[in-house]
Amino acid sequence: MAEHGLKIAVVGPQRTGKTLLCRALAEQPILLGEMSYQPTAAVRIQEISRVLGIDRVKVQFWDVSGSVQYQSYWPVLAKEVDGLLMVIDPNRPEQERDLETFYRNFAEPNNLYTRQCMVMAIQVQKEGGGLGGWQGLQGGLKKLSQSYVAINPANPAAGVQEAYSHLDVLFQGALQSKKEALESSYMNQEDQ
């Protein structure tokens, strides 16, 4: 089984559930109650392993702060990103403009294809909460893959399973692009 590594930047406005998602995926403890929201200072990195077909993939989630206070760090954090997961609060469609800024700063400098980018609306919910009715993106980013996931911080397993059903598509797209880039670099070396 071949092993590969992927760097996935997880970006979006503040308080959209980026850290909750990353911690849940990495099976890390999730804070509840008064201490449940702790703003990310610049970046948090979580790692997971996935098996995609014949490939074992070590995924690093770079959970990037949504605060403009850390915007000067974005070029460094965006360096060599293999994929981009943009997170939005489905109850705040005005955040779509913010996602366009993240796209320009993370996807465009890395020449990411649409298969390497995804928008995920995360509904943080309590037991028994419904999924709501997010209508998806309406602007320039509507060409990207979009998903909607509900996560209950007290019991995130169902939300994690749903998230993986979408994220595996992102991982496969990022892995395919990475393999193609490696193959191209090998071909160029042979030509010299």
Swiss-Prot record:
Keywords: Cell projection, Cilium, Flagellum, GTP-binding, Nucleotide-binding. It holds the Pfam family Roc. It is found in: Cell projection, Cilium, Flagellum. It comes from the Eukaryota. GTP binds at residues 12-19, 62-69. The keyword GTP-binding applies. One of its GO terms (molecular function) is GTP binding. GO terms for cellular component: motile cilium. InterPro entries: P-loop_NTPase. Gene3D superfamilies: P-loop containing nucleotide triphosphate hydrolases (3.40.50.300). Its main location: other. The keyword Transit peptide does not apply. Belongs to the small GTPase superfamily. Rab family. Component of the IFT complex B, composed of IFT88, IFT70, IFT52, IFT46, IFT27, IFT25 and IFT22. Component of the intraflagellar transport (IFT) complex B. Functions in regulating the cellular pool size of both complex A and complex B and thus plays a critical role in determining the cellular availability of IFT particles. This is Intraflagellar transport protein 22.
